[in-house]
Amino acid sequence: MADLVDHSPHHATKAAKLASASNVILIDNYDSFTWNIYQYLVLEGATVTVYRNDEVTVEDLVAKKPTQLVISPGPGHPDTDAGISNAVIKHFSGKVPIFGVCMGQQCMITSFGGKVDVTGEILHGKTSELKHDSKGVYQGLPTSLEVTRYHSLAGTHSTIPDCLEVTSRVELGDASGKNIIMGVRHKEFAVEGVQFHPESILTQYGRKMFRNFLELTAGTWDNKQGAAVAAPADKKLSILDKIYAHRKNAVDEQKKIPALRPEALQAAYDLNIAPPQLSFPDRLRQSDYPLSLMAEIKRASPSKGIISANVCAPAQAREYAKAGASVISVLTEPEWFKGTIDDLRAVRQSLEGLPNRPAVLRKEFVFEEYQILEARLAGADTVLLIVKMLDIELLTRLYHYSRSLGMEPLVEVNTPEEMKIAVDLGSEVIGVNNRDLTSFEVDLGTTSRLMDQVPESTIVCALSGISGPQDVEAYKKEGVKAILVGEALMRAPDTSAFVAQLLGGSNQNFAGASPSSPLVKICGTRTEEGALAAIQAGADLIGIIMVQGRSRLVPDDVALGISRVVKSTPRPADTLQQPSSATSLEWFDHSTNILRHPSRALLVGVFMNQPLSYVVSQQQKLGLDVVQLHGSEPLEWSSLIPVPVIRKFAPGDIGIARRAYHTLPLLDSGAGGSGELLEESGVKKVLDSDEGLRVILAGGLNPDNVAGTVKKLGQSGQKVVGLDVSSGVETNGAQDLEKIRAFVKSAKSIRQ
């Protein structure tokens, strides 16, 4: 850093009175720098009146007819400590020019829907190098200059609303390449702010910045003032053009990162590590509703600004799947829609293990193969291709490349000419965007008008602008097969209820089908007689111990005899209403059904910290229907064992709710057979940690306490889908047949 230079106007020449700044009002947020701002404004010829933020009303200011407004710095947070500043910005935006300094800028960001947060450092008089866009208050200034900062808060990049643009930045200074927002400007209104202090003696060209502001006379930029010098070029570009140009630059930069080079992505794909995919058209044809739902995860949009900035994409995806969505659309454009490819990757992971998961669509402005390959590696089943932004040659190339990766694209059209292109291309799925991407106007009749151009075999999806059942009725009659809904779903307080209302049906179709009574597992079985008694009593699972050194270890010859009894003895079957094949049933609801054989009990072999090869060989030798891992075996073993796997967890263990590995988790206190009851609060905490979790409960259960133990868990007890007993049905170390019968009866009576 160079020596500090005093840029203050020690012997400043006062400018002549500015007729355009004859009634400037300065809102004082109780900050000492307000005097310095007043000084600079007056030196530039303004006539200024100062009001503290709690001593004047908006109505008072309206009556005073200000020519310009300035919002001063101040201590605290813009949401709680700025008095009427936010109300002033909201009322006068578009009417008169407004300039905000430090907290004044933060008020502008929050007033238009953004957020401010801590920057990670508290600055008091620090000088930094500023980079700016040479428009607005920066007109006529060098592109790099020294400014002074007094702040700990600043606007956050991810929440800057679409109506504002970032005009200046300083580097974070940690070699990360990240920067802190130092200036914002409204794209339409003459509203501009700076995070630094132009009135500080260490800021270069501070007076010039105030002069540039004072020369503004209108409330908008459309009269060729200030920032509008460069605005006409932007005005000629549609939002689609802007996004395309921005994404092109961003993707070009991304491909320079060594790990993200096209060659690196191709090498990863060649290793066959992309998540398994499904057929997008086939999944669209499966729905319990009259139309298939493409449910969109949408944090923001150019037309609506911030919709739900803090949404957890994978959690939202599970909600959509539970509500019956056939497709989940994930917006991965970061600037206007606030999404990333990481959202898609997390969404795909969250759907792992669903028996009939929704397809995953990458909703992005795709213009090269790199983006399609990136999508497939992240887990996409399909990508969006927008006819309006691609020439026919490029569209054709991208379409066939996507199909070469097993992904039938969603081809988006808006006009009859674009529909003809999509049909000639051979598109199996065509989306009609009811929103014109050049004007962003919505016309829900667009889809209907284009239907007569489409072959009967083509799936047509209506995109954009759908908010309620009234928007859907006509589509049902006209042959539309699917609708895409984003904003309305994101704002719905109850996703499943909204979907049922929107598409006409009952969200009860999508509730997990649960047995009327829990599974019962009689463990530690050592005789054919014990197995037979348990089965005849109605037990679902017969457990035999395969752990060397344990008192309940069953020799192979005895185990084979028990196996024959289990497989030849019928038992009364519970009736379970199977869900529709189109339903995305939760993993643990599905796997509970797997452990409920329609006509007999299942034989479970219990192992603990034994080699995988031994576990597999014993499973094959003894004909085990299920394997139980009761030690610290890797989670991945569940996918390497050729039968369903029950895995033991203690409260607090990591991985209990991981889908697509263990069939069900068994919640137990120790090594098994200890007779120790689990602490009620610990069990509740585990069960309440994940809405979709289901468990087999073990540890200290017996015929007398099993019903009460589950009842004490309250509503959480509904997630207990199985009960495991060993020592609780023994007398003097041997299985007691009467206790077995009593336990099964008591356990089965819990939910009838």
Swiss-Prot record:
Residues 23-223 form the Glutamine amidotransferase type-1 domain. Keywords: Amino-acid biosynthesis, Aromatic amino acid biosynthesis, Decarboxylase, Glutamine amidotransferase, Isomerase, Lyase, Multifunctional enzyme, Tryptophan biosynthesis. One of its GO terms (biological process) is L-tryptophan biosynthetic process. Its EC number is 4.1.3.27, 4.1.1.48, 5.3.1.24. Residues 239-503 are annotated as: Indole-3-glycerol phosphate synthase. The active site is at C102, H197, E199. The keyword Lyase applies. Pfam families: GATase, IGPS, PRAI. It catalyses: N-(5-phospho-beta-D-ribosyl)anthranilate = 1-(2-carboxyphenylamino)-1-deoxy-D-ribulose 5-phosphate; 1-(2-carboxyphenylamino)-1-deoxy-D-ribulose 5-phosphate + H(+) = (1S,2R)-1-C-(indol-3-yl)glycerol 3-phosphate + CO2 + H2O; chorismate + L-glutamine = anthranilate + pyruvate + L-glutamate + H(+). CDD domains: GATase1_Anthranilate_Synthase, IGPS, PRAI. One of its GO terms (cellular component) is cytosol. L-glutamine binds at G74, P75, G76, Q106, S152, L153. Pathway: Amino-acid biosynthesis; L-tryptophan biosynthesis; L-tryptophan from chorismate: step 1/5; Amino-acid biosynthesis; L-tryptophan biosynthesis; L-tryptophan from chorismate: step 3/5; Amino-acid biosynthesis; L-tryptophan biosynthesis; L-tryptophan from chorismate: step 4/5. One of its GO terms (molecular function) is indole-3-glycerol-phosphate synthase activity. InterPro entries: Aldolase_TIM (IPR013785), Anth_synth/Amidotransfase (IPR050472), Anthranilate_synth_II (IPR016302), Class_I_gatase-like (IPR029062), GATASE (IPR017926), Indole-3-glycerol_P_synth_dom (IPR013798), Indole-3-GlycerolPSynthase_CS (IPR001468), PRAI_dom (IPR001240). Residues 519-752 are annotated as: N-(5'-phosphoribosyl)anthranilate isomerase. Trifunctional enzyme bearing the Gln amidotransferase (GATase) domain of anthranilate synthase, indole-glycerolphosphate synthase, and phosphoribosylanthranilate isomerase activities. This is Multifunctional tryptophan biosynthesis protein. It comes from Penicillium chrysogenum (Penicillium notatum). The gene is trpC.
